[in-house]
Amino acid sequence: MMVPSFILWDVGSSVYTYGSLFIIALIIWHVRRSHRGLRLGPIKSCTKCFRRIKQKPSDRTLRVKKRTTKEETEKLQKLLSNMKRQGWLPQEGSVRRLLCSDPSCPICNAMALEIQQLLGVENKKTSSSLLRHSRSFSCLEALSPPKVLNDQSSELSKVLNGQSSELSKVLNGQSSELSKVLNDQSSELSKVLNDQSSELSSQHSKDISLPPKFMQSQSTDQKLTLSAPLSTGNTVLQCYHPAPQQQPEPQGSNAFQDVSGLSSSSMDEHGVPANQQKKRKKTKKLVSKNQAAPSEAEMENKMTFFSHWVNPEVKCDRPEESFAFYKSETGAKPKTGEPKKSSAKVRAEEPNLEKHAKDLKAKPLHAKRNI
């Protein structure tokens, strides 16, 4: 007991005992706690948080996929309905050619089958179509990643939209061209109709607006030719009356030839009736040209002049006008046709006629007749 190593035990035996007991208790508590943790696992609150952290990204991906599938199906249905209305549905082999050139590609084959099913279904409900789309998309997801499917669907939608826009442009261009052609044809027809109506109206106005003096002169000439008695004889009367002062001198020769034609026609009415009608028509035309607007006094003077020329025995209260009868060169033989005159003879007679017209203004002429 007197050994120095045992001095501490003797001095602080109480402190040593209490300290050793406290250390032993701590070791036991720690061992028990670790043993409980291995049995029960983590705490419930911690497990819930851990589960939420793990489940959030998976739920989001599923929800996004569902939304995308619904939106895509709705867009496809709208496009198909519009294409069916306007008749723009593609053929069976054209869709597969657009997708891929490799015939053994499983993704393109699946898409082509899906498109054929969509085009073939017309009268089924939307629920069945949605289920079919979901199944097809699930199969495609198993075969390929979702990015490839989204890219292919976007490309298909772009192609369909481009085709629809091109077809609408073509239809609009054709409709505008047809409208232009119809407008041009209608304008041409309206112009033709207006021209025809204007021509008809002008013709009608010309027919209505005939000069009354010309009509009166024609009626008086017809009365004279009908009322004048026929003279019998073998002589040919050539009459001449002076032209008015307003007309030029060459018209005197024309008047002389016209009156001579009238006298020969009146003398030969019994022989040639056909020639008589032709001569009457010629005289009417020449009288209307030479006398464009005759007055009433001139018409009365003509009446008296023609009555004296056809039959000199007819009497009238008016004073006698100056006229002359020339002997015919043919003698007493009657003429059966029109007297033929050469152009040289007519040219030689023109200066004599002008001189004779001047003399007639100064002195009255006497009528001569050869029986």
Swiss-Prot record:
It is a single-pass membrane protein. It comes from Mus musculus (Mouse). The gene is Spata31f3. This is Protein SPATA31F3. Residues 62-86 form a coiled coil. InterPro entries: SPATA31F3-like (IPR027970). The chain crosses the membrane at residues 7-29. Belongs to the SPATA31 family. It holds the Pfam family DUF4599. PANTHER family: ACROSOME-SPECIFIC PROTEIN (PTHR21859), PROTEIN SPATA31F1-RELATED (PTHR21859:SF15). One of its GO terms (cellular component) is membrane. Its main location: membrane. It is found in: Membrane. Residues 189-203, 244-266 have a biased composition (Polar residues). Residues 189-222, 240-299, 326-371 are annotated as: Disordered. Residues 330-362 have a biased composition (Basic and acidic residues).
